[in-house]
């Protein structure tokens, strides 16, 4: 019975030690999370780091500012500048995450165009060639179109327009790559679906001429003559000097056929009202 007090004393000492250790950890953690420097100083320090090219350090400093002083005037801009600093540091996932956070928390604000520009730029830089996965291209295009539609007067709108053309051309090239593969494998329906995407979604790219010609080839192979004739008619009307029109016209002529537009064709509808054409050959 005399041993009980000793055991109680030992247990009490252990409890005090554990509590002290936990208290010390909490204190250390709180110090790491919350910076007691005023937000103006933290912002100036982060800005100085960025100006000296220390982008990774600057990004973390901006994040520290947002975490320590979330309701300060500097905190909101710190989020988008953290995204920019991460982008300059080559840390794409972190840049996108910070910029997306800004667009969710502060849509329509002064720096929203910059946030979308950062996201678009990060994905645009990660675009792959036409024979590879186009996820980054599609995400870049989505953000670029947001810039064009929501912020047409922003400093990033003109750059967005140029990049949209490049991204759409890349996507069209990818569809053509896959479509030609299916055509070579004589899977004409699958090939048409790929070429159709180019015709309906990427009419302003350099690939649409070949897409129309290959649509004609595939429909001829399937015996769907009226669609082939429509494809050649639309091709000839819009690109009369194209080598692809010459090839498509020769294909019809070899079968005793000529270009003829069908108003019920998806091709006509895709190009809206296509004027009636002369049924002569290319000049």
Regions found by a protein language model. Name each.
Residues 2-7, 20-283:
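Acidic, polar-rich low-complexity tracts and alpha-helical solenoid repeat scaffolds
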């Amino acid at each position: 019975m005399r041993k009980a007090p000793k055991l109680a004393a030992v247990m009490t000492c252990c409890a005090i030690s554990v509590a002290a250790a936990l208290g010390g950890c909490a204190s250390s953690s709180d110090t790491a999370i919350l910076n007691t420097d005023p937000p103006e100083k933290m912002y100036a320090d982060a800005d100085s780091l960025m100006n000296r090219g220390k982008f990774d350090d600057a990004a973390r400093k901006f994040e520290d500012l947002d975490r320590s002083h979330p309701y300060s005037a500097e905190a909101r801009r710190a989020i988008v500048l953290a995204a920019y600093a991460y982008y300059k540091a080559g840390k794409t996932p972190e840049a996108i995450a910070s910029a997306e956070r800004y667009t969710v928390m502060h849509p329509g604000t002064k720096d929203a165009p910059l946030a979308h520009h950062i996201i678009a730029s990060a994905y645009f830089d990660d675009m792959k060639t036409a024979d590879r996965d186009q996820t980054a291209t599609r995400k870049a295009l989505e953000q670029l179109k947001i810039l064009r539609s929501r912020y047409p007067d922003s400093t990033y709108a003109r750059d967005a327009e140029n990049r949209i053309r490049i991204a759409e051309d890349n996507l069209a090239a990818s569809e053509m790559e896959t479509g030609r593969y299916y055509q070579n494998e004589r899977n004409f329906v699958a090939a048409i679906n790929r070429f159709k995407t180019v015709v309906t979604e990427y009419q302003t790219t350099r690939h649409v001429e070949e897409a129309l010609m290959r649509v004609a080839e595939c429909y001829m192979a399937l015996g769907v003559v009226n669609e082939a004739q429509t494809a050649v008619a639309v091709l000839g009307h819009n690109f009369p000097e194209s080598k692809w029109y010459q090839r498509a016209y020769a294909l019809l002529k070899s079968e005793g056929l000529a270009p003829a537009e069908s108003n019920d064709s998806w091709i006509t509808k895709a190009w809206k009202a296509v004027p009636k054409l002369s049924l002569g050959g290319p000049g």
